[in-house]
Amino acid sequence: MSATMAEYQSSTSRRYDTQIHRRVTRTVNVGGVLIGSDHPVRVQSMINEDTLDVEGATAGIRRLHEAGCEIVRLTVPSLGHAKAVGEICQRLRETYQPVPLVADVHHNGMKIALEVANHVDKVRINPGLFVFDKADPDRTEFSGEEIASIRERIAENFEPLVTRLKQQDKALRIGVNHGSLAERMLFAYGDTPLGMVESAMEFVRICDSLDFHNIVISMKASRAPVMLAAYRLMADTMDQEGFNYPLHLGVTEAGDGDYGRIKSTAGIATLLAEGLGDTIRVSLTEAPEKEIPVCYSILQSIGLRKTMVEYISCPSCGRTLFNLEEVVQKVRDSTSHLVGLDIAVMGCIVNGPGEMADADYGYVGKGPGVISLYRGRDEIRKVSESEGVDALIQLIKDDGRWVDPP
């Protein structure tokens, strides 16, 4: 038997809720950009220039920031690179503006992290590589004493970085990668989401012991199912232990083209819809600035941020009274610079008015060569198809919702 409306409305389950209820997370400040559940889901990316190329890296950061990237990461594999970051920050101040920067530090990066922490707003470390020991092919197990010794060495090397970040009120990302778990984690947990979570929690607990909480956590994998499981388990584990750190979402090494975008969306949007995630990156094998529109499209498609026009259009059928694809493109070309509007382009009046009822404006086929313009649910006027796009623009202008393109 179908549920009654009263039963539906009284249900406490969020499974049927049209709103996304974000997991409550603390606020982390990254160069003035606030990450956490009280703030918009943030968009990040990473330059692909060599950090030693100060001018090239500065230009890459600027391109990303101008494209809408809110936090930019750059690789710092050596002390020389760490010092170059200071020059990059200076060049940004001189030629553009300060941009929130994250330094990516990997293999045995203790000294590198301490140096670059003086320049950037956040340091990202990989728990599997921060204190790195080459895998021993002859090893069959780790003794309890060996594990304790490794943990002691990790704490000894990690604490100075935590102390510096705390003193400077800067942030840390504990960024686990599925493909680079430490050997002892692989022995203990296998190549699993649990191993990823335990890798992160080891560092989280050290931070907690030092009363440092300006932390963001990521659980990246190149396969979406692994990434999904790891983030869910990480959130559950933090909840059980009383931690509420923000999550940085991403499918690493997603590839390029349509499939890379689809693969990233499958992982990122799924978690966002579950309320997990406070900042995202879509990793594509393309120019970094091409990642940014994908991020904003994901966020808009599930209602977390609105930064562009939302276009609603039917797939076309035998009832369509004009070239729908051509008209949609004309409308998009004329209005894509606007922010916050919903515009529907529907091929006929059979389903058009109902399916576009939530739109701010509608363009609907009325008859051969004739279209109707709508404001919300109200039909405003009929015009010839040749005048349709211009008349739609005029209607938006009449309502005071038009701005000229930049």
Swiss-Prot record:
GO terms of molecular function: 4 iron, 4 sulfur cluster binding; 4-hydroxy-3-methylbut-2-en-1-yl diphosphate synthase activity (ferredoxin); iron ion binding
Cofactor binding, note field: Binds 1 [4Fe-4S] cluster.
Keywords: 4Fe-4S, Iron, Iron-sulfur, Isoprene biosynthesis, Metal-binding, Oxidoreductase
Pfam families in the record: GcpE (PF04551)
Amino-acid positions noted as binding [4Fe-4S] cluster in the UniProt annotation, renumbered to this chain: C314, C317, C348, E355
Similarity comment: Belongs to the IspG family.
Protein name (Swiss-Prot/TrEMBL): 4-hydroxy-3-methylbut-2-en-1-yl diphosphate synthase (ferredoxin)
Source organism of the structure: Prochlorococcus marinus (strain MIT 9313)
Origin organism lineage: Bacteria, Bacillati, Cyanobacteriota, Cyanophyceae, Synechococcales
Gene that specifies this protein: ispG
